[in-house]
Amino acid sequence: MRAERLSPLLALGLLVAGIRSVHCLPENVVVKDRHRRVDGHTLASSNTDFAFSLYKQLALKNPNKNVMFSPLSVSMALAFLSLGARGPTLTEILEGLKFNLTEIQETQIHQGFQHLLQALNRPRNQLQLSVGNAMFVQEELKLLDKFIEDARVLYSSEAFPTNFRDPEAAKSLINDYVKNKTQGKIEELFKDLSPRTELVLVNYVYFKAQWKTRFDPKHTEQAEFHVSDNKTVEVPMMTLDLETPYFRDEELGCTLVELTYTSNDSALFILPDKGKMQDLEAKLTPEMLTRWRNSLQPRRIHELYLPKFSIKSNYELNDTLSQMGIKKIFTDADLSGITGTADLVVSQVVHGAALDVDEEGTEGAAATGIGIERTFLRIIVRVNRPFLIAVVLKDTQSIIFLGKVTNPSEA
């Protein structure tokens, strides 16, 4: 029997152009506060805050559509860029990432991402997870030695000389790299490149895991999914009887079900009551997520209905990030920490993601029965209307994937 699996694949690219070529546009980090431990957990709260802020912007710009992205990928790419930012540009990036610079220093932020990368890329028996960064640099562009070293040590970044004056060849080089790193799931991160491009920073994430309690493909049947009041589509609906963390939030009008993987990481499915999606989206905060996670209790769900879906997304984030307060990188940036001169601006930020829930993969382990509280109430959860999903890595509490499924039948 094959196990149902969840496979998010993600990539983000930051495209940096040189003002001088455009003419039309003008191993360890030493931190001062040695008593404060800086690791992946240090970033969790800020990253979650950034995740929900970005989600709200994308949902606003894409009403009644599927929304899929990796908060981790976007925040890591911007933090990577901030290595070369100076002055107000640096402050704007870090504050846009929801860091309180009166409480945490820049060096601590980079060290936190360094530890997070190391934690994410540790070998795992039950999980395929790969996270990384890369720089594609115009052949004659001279980068500062410190930037190259910091990029390598803190963000494990590879660097590739690239001829952007031949934009088609450069595009193929970058897209092929991302395609390879995401196991072929993201084929075209960049649809076009300008010959004036000087530098492209790329972050990618590949994640594949099997459910701890498997779905039986023989029980998957076509069923109705209510996209809206006046639109219904037929989708393959999986079904399962299991014991798993569950919470019914009467205050916000939603039902939460957490499904765990064999790696003990998890996917949190948030199903708003009919007509409650916008109210719920408006109230998404790190505090709300903490309340939900603390309220989840093991319950027997007699019938869980969950749609299969395969969704790809591609976003250009320039306007979105500007509305979130990260503006200077696109106009009057000071990225002098990259080359030593302030003549670079970011011309394009693109993000691609693909999320598959399907029947491939190996058999999952049996569900544990530790501390299960049985109830005589028969719980039935039908995920047959738009819902939210958050994939959370247990050891770092990082939201690696966040999205809204409005229509599972749309790729």
Swiss-Prot record:
This is Serpin A3-3. Serine protease inhibitor. Strongly inhibits elastase and trypsin stoichiometrically at the molar ratio of 1:1. Acts as a moderate inhibitor of plasmin and chymotrypsin. Does not inhibit thrombin, urokinase, kallikrein, tissue plasminogen activator, cathepsin G or the cysteine proteases papain, cathepsin B or cathepsin L. It is found in: Cytoplasmic vesicle, Secretory vesicle, Chromaffin granule; Secreted. The gene is SERPINA3-3. PROSITE patterns: SERPIN. The record marks L377, R378 as: Reactive bond. GO terms for cellular component: chromaffin granule; cytoplasmic vesicle; extracellular space. The lineage of its organism: Eukaryota, Metazoa, Chordata, Craniata, Vertebrata. SUPFAM superfamilies: Serpins. Belongs to the serpin family. Residues 1-24 form the signal peptide. Glycans are attached at N100, N180, N230, N264, N318. GO terms for molecular function: serine-type endopeptidase inhibitor activity. Keywords: Cytoplasmic vesicle, Glycoprotein, Protease inhibitor, Secreted, Serine protease inhibitor, Signal. It comes from Bos taurus. Disulfide bonds: none annotated. PANTHER family: ALPHA-1-ANTICHYMOTRYPSIN, SERINE PROTEASE INHIBITOR, SERPIN. Homodimer. Its main location: cytoplasm. InterPro entries: Serpin_CS (IPR023795), Serpin_dom (IPR023796), Serpin_fam (IPR000215), Serpin_sf (IPR036186), Serpin_sf_1 (IPR042178), Serpin_sf_2 (IPR042185). CDD domains: serpinA3_A1AC.
